[in-house]
């Protein structure tokens, strides 16, 4: 089922003398109702396209693409759409095509949104091992919510109860391996910048 992105919607727009829609001379703020699904949405850039399957409650023979910007989404927090998410929206005809003016979930509910978040340059990924219970080592909770009684103390790096992290041979071995790696050109420049 393909979609037509440049197809004009002329219903409800004033007609010129020759009977065609007079988009350029009319008030461009005519608002229409539509519903459909999110075709795609770029979370980093904050925009995407909706595939409109109904206009003013009537099924369309050929689905239409409608531009959507994150500022038009009705939801809390980080605004985005998930591919295939059902939406209801208002839209208008602009010089660039069809453009949404407000987007909600079905029945006016807030949009669900994408689980994806934009990658930020320079931000390192959080270590998986850092988000675990210090009491039992479980990944689904922290020590204050741990249902087990206090466990014997153990190394936080390798979980061995025979030593603490300060004397951990695995951590010392990992640090030694990092020292043996060749220094990159960027790392050589760091001392010069610091001076």
Swiss-Prot record:
* Residue ranges of every copy of the CSD domain listed in the record: 33-106
Q: Where in or outside the cell is it found?
A: Cytoplasm; Rough endoplasmic reticulum; Cytoplasm, P-body; Cytoplasm, Stress granule
The residues the record assigns to binding Zn(2+) 1 are: 133, 136, 141, 146
Disordered: where is this region? 98-127
* CDD domains (alphabetical): CSP_CDS
Q: Which Pfam families match?
A: CSD, Lin-28A-like_zf-CCHC_2, zf-CCHC
Output compositional bias ranges, type Basic residues.
Answer: 118-127
Q: Name one GO molecular function term.
A: zinc ion binding
So where does Zn(2+) 2 get bound?
Answer: 155, 158, 163, 168
Hydrolase among the record's keywords? no
Residue ranges of the region described as Flexible linker: 107-130
> Zinc finger, CCHC-type: residue spans?
131-148, 153-170
Transcription keyword on record: no
Its keywords, alphabetically, are: Cytoplasm, Endoplasmic reticulum, Metal-binding, Nucleus, Repeat, RNA-binding, RNA-mediated gene silencing, Zinc, Zinc-finger
How is this protein annotated for GO cellular component? cytoplasm; cytoplasmic stress granule; nucleolus; nucleus; P-body; rough endoplasmic reticulum
Listed InterPro entries: CSD (IPR011129), CSP_DNA-bd (IPR002059), Lin-28_RNA-binding (IPR051373), Lin-28A-like_Znf-CCHC_2 (IPR054081), NA-bd_OB-fold (IPR012340), Znf_CCHC (IPR001878), Znf_CCHC_sf (IPR036875)
The highest taxon in the source lineage is: Eukaryota
Function of the protein: RNA-binding protein that inhibits processing of pre-let-7 miRNAs and regulates translation of mRNAs that control developmental timing, pluripotency and metabolism. Seems to recognize a common structural G-quartet (G4) feature in its miRNA and mRNA targets. 'Translational enhancer' that drives specific mRNAs to polysomes and increases the efficiency of protein synthesis. Its association with the translational machinery and target mRNAs results in an increased number of initiation events per molecule of mRNA and, indirectly, in mRNA stabilization.
Which PANTHER family does its entry note? PROTEIN LIN-28, PROTEIN LIN-28 HOMOLOG A
- What is the annotated quaternary arrangement, including any partners? Monomer.
Protein family: Belongs to the lin-28 family.
What's the name of the protein? Answer: Protein lin-28 homolog A
* Organism whose genome encodes this protein: Xenopus laevis (African clawed frog)
Its organism's taxonomic lineage begins at: Eukaryota, Metazoa, Chordata, Craniata, Vertebrata
């Amino acid at each position: 089922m393909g979609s037509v992105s440049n197809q004009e919607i002329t219903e409800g727009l004033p007609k010129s003398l020759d009977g065609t829609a007079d988009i350029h001379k009319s008030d461009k703020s005519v608002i229409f109702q539509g519903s459909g699904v999110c075709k795609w949405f770029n979370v980093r850039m904050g925009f995407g396209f909706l595939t409109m399957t109904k206009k003013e409650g009537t099924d369309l023979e050929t689905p239409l693409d409608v531009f959507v910007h994150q500022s038009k989404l009705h939801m809390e927090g980080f605004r985005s759409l998930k591919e295939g998410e059902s939406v209801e929206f208002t839209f208008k005809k602009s010089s660039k095509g069809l453009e949404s003016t407000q987007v909600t979930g079905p029945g006016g509910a807030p949009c669900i949104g994408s689980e994806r978040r934009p990658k930020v340059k320079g931000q390192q990924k959080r270590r998986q091992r850092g988000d675990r219970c210090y009491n039992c080592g479980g990944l689904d909770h922290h020590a204050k919510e741990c249902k087990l009684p206090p466990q014997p103390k153990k190394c936080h790096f390798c979980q061995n109860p025979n030593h603490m992290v300060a004397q951990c041979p695995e951590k010392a071995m990992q640090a030694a391996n990092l020292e043996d790696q060749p220094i990159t050109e960027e790392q050589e420049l760091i001392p010069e910048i610091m001076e």
